[in-house]
C-alpha cells in the first residue's frame, strides 16, 4: 500500500491537470490566426500597402518582373525601375527653361517648351529673333540671348511680354472694319485674291487687274490719302502716318503748284461734297534723283527715281475715325526679317484703270507678292537701287499705274498693317515680264522720324 504522502501528491496533480492544459494549448480559432498563411494580394493598390516594395525590392534584390507584379502597370513599373537600377537622373534638374525631365537607365530625356531645344533645352531658338519673330507681335530684339519685344507707336507691350495692346480706338495699322471677320487681318479684297498668289493662270481674268482693280470697301484702306492739284484732279496718292503727316513720292511734288489732300473716301466722283485738307509744308528728300537730269553734257532720261520719298505736313490735323487710320511705321530690322518675307503686300490708289487711260473715281486695291532682288534687277531696263524693291506679277496683268504714284504699299503682320513701300515707278502698267517698283521705306525710317519731329 502506497504511503499516504505519495497518494496526496498524485491526487493534487490530477486535480490541477485541466488548468495546466488550458494554459499550454490555444483554442483552435485563436491558434488559426497565427498559424494560417495569409494569401498575398496582387491588386493595383498593393503599392500603397506598407512593406510590399520593401519586401520585394529593398530588403532583397528583385527582378523587373517582380516589380511588375507589384505595380501591375507598365508606366509605373518603368518609372520605379529606372530609379531603382541606378538612381534618379532627374534629381539635379538638368532641363533648362522649365523643360520636363524623364528618368532613364543611365540617362534622362528633356521635353522642351516651345522655342527651346537641345539635350537640356539649353538652346533658345529665338535668341536672334529669326524664328517666328521671337513670338513678338510687333518688333523683336535680341539682348544677351534674351528676347525683348516692343510695339509700334500707339501700342503698349502686353503683360505677357509678347503681345501689343492698342492704346486708343484709332491706333495705327488697325483695320477696324475687318476686325469682326473670321480672318480679321485680311479684308475682303485680300481674301478674294489669296488664291491668285498660289497659282498662275494662262488666261487671267481682266477683272483682277490692279489697273482695272477691285474696289476697296469703306474702311478697308483707312491709311489711303489722295493728292489733288489746283484743278482738283487726282495726280498722286499718299499714306497717312499721323494726324499731320502724309507720306508720298518725291516725284509727285513738282507736278503742281498747289496740293490739297483727301482722306477717308473711296469714291471721289463728287469732289464738291468732299472736304479738301490744306497743306502747310512739303519735305522732299535732298538726295532725290529726278527722272531726267543733266548727265555729262547731255540730257539723259535715267529714270532712277532714287530717294523717291517726301512728307507732306498738313495745315489742320486729320480727324481719325473707322475710315481714317494711320499706317504703322516699322523698324528697319522688322521689315527685313519679317515683313518682306510675307506672301504679299497691299497696294491701293485712284490711278488709271488702264495704261494711258482715265483715273478711277473709286479706290482700287490689289495684293502683290514680293519679288526677290535678283529677279527684280534682271527684269528692268533701268537701275534698281538699294532704295527700291519690286512687287507684282511677271505674267498676270496686275499692277499699279499712273495716278497711283506716291500711294501706299502696306504689309500686314497679324492684325497690324505697316507701311513698307511707296509706289514709285514702273515700265508701263501690268506689262508682261515687268514689275512695279517701290521706294523701300525701311531705308528711310530715321529720315521719316526726323521730319515728323520737326515743329
Curated annotation (Swiss-Prot):
Query: How would you describe the post-translational modification of this protein?
Result: The vitamin K-dependent, enzymatic carboxylation of some glutamate residues allows the modified protein to bind calcium.
- Descriptive protein name: Venom prothrombin activator nigrarin-D
Q: Where in the cell is it found?
A: Secreted
**Tissues/organs with expression:** Expressed by the venom gland.
Instruction: Name its species.
Output: Cryptophis nigrescens
GO BP terms: namely: blood coagulation; induction of blood coagulation in another organism; proteolysis; venom-mediated blood coagulation
What does UniProt give as the signal peptide span? Answer: 1-20
- Which residues are sugar-modified? 92, 254
